[in-house]
């Protein structure tokens, strides 16, 4: 099995390639892990890999160009048939059933986010699937990527002496994140939502909240059951549901 990794900290993956069961799998050529660092695709002397989000707010997003070029390079190295996965809190929860599905792929490319995440248009144009290891926040996608690699590697013939099962984690309640956008304003014909460039902070706040509610309703509706929504949240959720069903 071949796995490509896009990460600002490729050295972290020595934990996978040099130690334990996965390290032995790499040594015996049952598993191959290759890494690409977006910093290697920058053009400025500071090797900048972050950029400001449209609409303001705390934190930064990963810069589009270096990340996009790294993904394209990994795709070229993989050839046909590689599935590109973004490790994201907004993704499908990784459980044993999901691991079994992913293990059917001979080639995977794992994109590890940092900062506040990546531009939504990169997800739309470059990513095949989003996966999450749980409803909590980490500083980056590297640990989720290593979790996925470790879990999937167990299904590679010859890696384990016998087939094994893993326990599923429990998850906390909460809303999923809203889409994020950074430069450029237009990417492959897809534009940043005008509200994020309007400068109207209250409208931006409402848009982000509404997007979060809609995503949670569409992707993880069970999370809403344990939340005591405010009057504003209920109103925005009803609007989002009406727009989606119209």
From Swiss-Prot:
GO terms for cellular component: cytosol. CDD domains: TrmD-like (cd18080). It is found in: Cytoplasm. It catalyses: guanosine(37) in tRNA + S-adenosyl-L-methionine = N(1)-methylguanosine(37) in tRNA + S-adenosyl-L-homocysteine + H(+). GO terms for molecular function: tRNA (guanine(37)-N1)-methyltransferase activity. S-adenosyl-L-methionine binds at residues 86, 113, 133-138. Belongs to the RNA methyltransferase TrmD family. Homodimer. This is tRNA (guanine-N(1)-)-methyltransferase. It comes from Haemophilus influenzae (strain ATCC 51907 / DSM 11121 / KW20 / Rd). The gene is trmD.
């Amino acid at each position: 099995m071949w796995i490509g990794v896009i990460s600002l900290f490729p050295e972290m993956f020595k934990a996978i390639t040099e130690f334990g069961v996965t390290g032995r799998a790499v040594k015996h050529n049952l598993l191959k892990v290759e890494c690409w660092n977006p910093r290697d695709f920058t053009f400025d002397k500071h090797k900048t890999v972050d950029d400001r989000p449209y609409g303001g707010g705390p934190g930064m997003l990963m810069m589009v160009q270096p990340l996009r070029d790294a993904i394209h390079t990994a795709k070229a190295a993989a050839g046909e048939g590689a599935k590109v996965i973004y490790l994201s809190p907004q993704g499908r929860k990784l459980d044993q059933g999901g691991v079994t599905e992913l293990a059917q792929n001979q080639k995977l490319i794992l994109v590890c986010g940092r900062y506040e995440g990546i531009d939504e248009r990169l997800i739309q144009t470059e990513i095949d699937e989003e996966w999450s290891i749980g409803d909590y926040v980490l500083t980056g996608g590297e640990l989720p990527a290593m979790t996925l690699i470790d879990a999937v590697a167990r299904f590679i013939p010859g890696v384990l002496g016998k087939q094994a099962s893993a326990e599923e984690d429990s998850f906390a309640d909460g809303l999923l994140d809203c889409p994020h956008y950074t430069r450029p304003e237009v990417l492959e014909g897809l534009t940043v939502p005008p509200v994020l460039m309007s400068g109207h902070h209250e409208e931006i706040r409402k848009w982000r909240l509404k997007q979060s509610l809609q995503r949670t309703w569409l992707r993880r509706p069970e999370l809403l059951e344990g939340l005591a929504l405010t009057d504003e949240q209920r109103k925005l959720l009803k609007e989002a549901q009406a727009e989606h069903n119209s």
